[in-house]
Amino acid sequence: MTQTLYDKLMNAHVIRRDNSTELIYIDRQLIHEVTSPQAFEGLAIAGRKPWSTSANLAVPDHNVPTTNRSSGINGISDPISKLQIETLDKNCKTFGINEIPMNDIRQGIVHVVGPEQGFTLPGMSIVCGDSHTSTHGALGALAFGIGTSEVEHVLATGCLWQSKSKNFNIEVSGKLNKHVSAKDIALYIIGKIGTAGGTGHAIEFSGDTIQSLSIEGRMTLCNMAIEAGARVGMVAVDDKTIDYVKGRILAPSGAKWSKAVEYWHTLHSDKNAHFEKIAHFNAKDIKPQVTWGTSPEMVITIDGYIPNPANAKNHTEKVSWENALNYMQLTADIKISDIKIDKVFIGSCTNSRIEDLRIVASVLKDKKIANNIKLALVVPGSGLIKKQAEKEGLDKIFINSGFEWREAGCSMCLAMNADKLKVGERCISTSNRNFEGRQGQGSFTHLVSPAIAAASAITGHFSEVK
């Protein structure tokens, strides 16, 4: 019987089936400071120990400051942020969980650190108390976000009851246009299928365009699968996947490596495997994208115009557009390139890897950011990425252009740490969400690729790469 990649991974981890749900074994769990305190507290109250300490890896990321790290935790000004990181440290020590602490050079965003360390491996089932866990599917893994109570359940038992998703194949074919990246592909797809297009499905991205992407690019794509409504996003294993994993600290070696690679080569959908839903896109139709509203599906090309609600396809969409225009303080039918921006954020679990930073540096080299830009940040996804960028001299390009070069963390992706927008500020961001107040109360977020963020920083308004 032919199987999709998702079917293969689910079947490989099923312990028991019960009507419409399946009890599956969880190979790895990533933990951060926001969704874990109650889970550890539940273990303590019940007097339980973790099923497998080695199956878990913790790293603080949401609340960590991206400046003034020399004082450690005591340097965190916000008492709640400080408490959450202190609590993670304490819980990991109490329960024997391996943690990469705040000032360790390996620290970073959990969805960057997992693959970087080799903790994320093809064929594994991977969970985290974070919706963007779908990122890890780029390595041919079964990865999805879970809630706090489920974090506790995985800690205690190493298992989870899950309802099986339907299969959705999104195929992208052809050569990408110049300056078009995985982020543009993701936003373009979401613009076409909507934020509910993948609801109830596991999305497998396929086609020669996807195969041409680096692993970093595939991570960006799978990271955004959740924004299309899917819980799971994945790409089949190929030689790029195996080359990426090889030699990483926690990856297998020797005879175990050879055995693993043999299995990993089977992690692709079989020919003629059944998908409940299929969508095809041509790469030549994809241009650099930018969101204009309060949902990732509210997206246009960088040379496009703000949509007019009068042209909405139905009443629901019309009202949604009107509300978005009102919140974003935008006027229909104006060219988006005429809109000025206040701040620029390059980072997040979507676009903070070394490939992203190299692209940004190539656009910024020998240029300065516009005078109207109040703040421009480049925040690497991990301390190791920061180290590599500095080795290549990218940090000097960022700083010379007027950007601030920060420490690793989630930073301005969400208003949970010191890096946030003020009321009325408009930000062009390489992150993944643009709902009301995401980057700060009363702020306006526009999602773009790293290249477009850098180009727009130079001109002070939404711009293509020149």
Curated annotation (Swiss-Prot):
EC number per UniProt: 4.2.1.33
Cofactor names: [4Fe-4S] cluster
Record GO terms (molecular function): 3-isopropylmalate dehydratase activity; 4 iron, 4 sulfur cluster binding; metal ion binding
UniProt keywords, alphabetically: 4Fe-4S, Amino-acid biosynthesis, Branched-chain amino acid biosynthesis, Iron, Iron-sulfur, Leucine biosynthesis, Lyase, Metal-binding
Pfam families: Aconitase
Record's function text: Catalyzes the isomerization between 2-isopropylmalate and 3-isopropylmalate, via the formation of 2-isopropylmaleate.
Enzyme class label: lyase
GO terms of biological process kind: L-leucine biosynthetic process
Quaternary structure, from the entry: Heterodimer of LeuC and LeuD.
Family: Belongs to the aconitase/IPM isomerase family. LeuC type 1 subfamily.
The protein's name: 3-isopropylmalate dehydratase large subunit
InterPro entries named in the record: 3-IsopropMal_deHydase_lsu, Acnase/IPM_dHydase_lsu_aba_1/3, Acoase/IPM_deHydtase_lsu_aba, Aconitase_4Fe-4S_BS, Aconitase_4Fe-4S_dom, IPM_dehydratase_rel_enz, IPMI_cat
Pathway where it operates: Amino-acid biosynthesis; L-leucine biosynthesis; L-leucine from 3-methyl-2-oxobutanoate: step 2/4
CDD domains named in the record: IPMI
Gene encoding the protein: leuC
SUPFAM superfamilies, per database record: Aconitase iron-sulfur domain
UniProt keyword annotation of Iron present: yes
Cofactor note text: Binds 1 [4Fe-4S] cluster per subunit.
Superkingdom of this protein's organism: Bacteria
